[in-house]
């Protein structure tokens, strides 16, 4: 009986431990921007490849070479993900500005929710593909 209680307690505790990284490849599945719901783009995909502390974002079009459009650093702290864009292929108002997001992981879905420095409220959904 003690053994079962110990196993139950350990399982319960481990279920509350957050991952230390987002390592892997994630594909954009849609989001909510200032209250307006938007689906994933059609005809191409947006993917982020996370390492232990950095990420690179790509536009993936069938038959074309992936095009990097963004890169940056991130850090996980509790339920927060601090994202700092260090490269953008387009002019950006958020370059080198740390942006805190509330993040959640459920199964293979990453949700990032926060407010950009421009005031825009975002909630994005990313699906792990690798």
What spans do the regions from the language model cover?
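Sec-dependent N-terminal signal peptides
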Residues: 4-13
């Amino acid at each position: 009986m003690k053994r079962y209680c110990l196993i139950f307690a350990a399982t319960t505790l481990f279920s509350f431990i957050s991952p230390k990284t987002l390592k892997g490849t994630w594909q954009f599945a849609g989001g909510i921007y200032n209250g307006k719901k938007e689906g994933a783009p059609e005809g191409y995909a947006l993917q982020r490849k996370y390492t232990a502390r950095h990420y690179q974002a790509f536009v993936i079009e069938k038959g074309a070479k992936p095009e990097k459009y963004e890169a940056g650093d991130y850090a996980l702290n509790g339920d927060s993900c601090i994202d700092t864009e260090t490269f953008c292929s387009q002019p950006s108002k958020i370059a080198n500005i740390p942006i805190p997001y509330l993040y959640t992981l459920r199964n293979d879905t990453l949700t990032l929710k926060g407010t950009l420095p421009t005031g825009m409220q975002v909630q994005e959904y990313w699906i792990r593909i690798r």
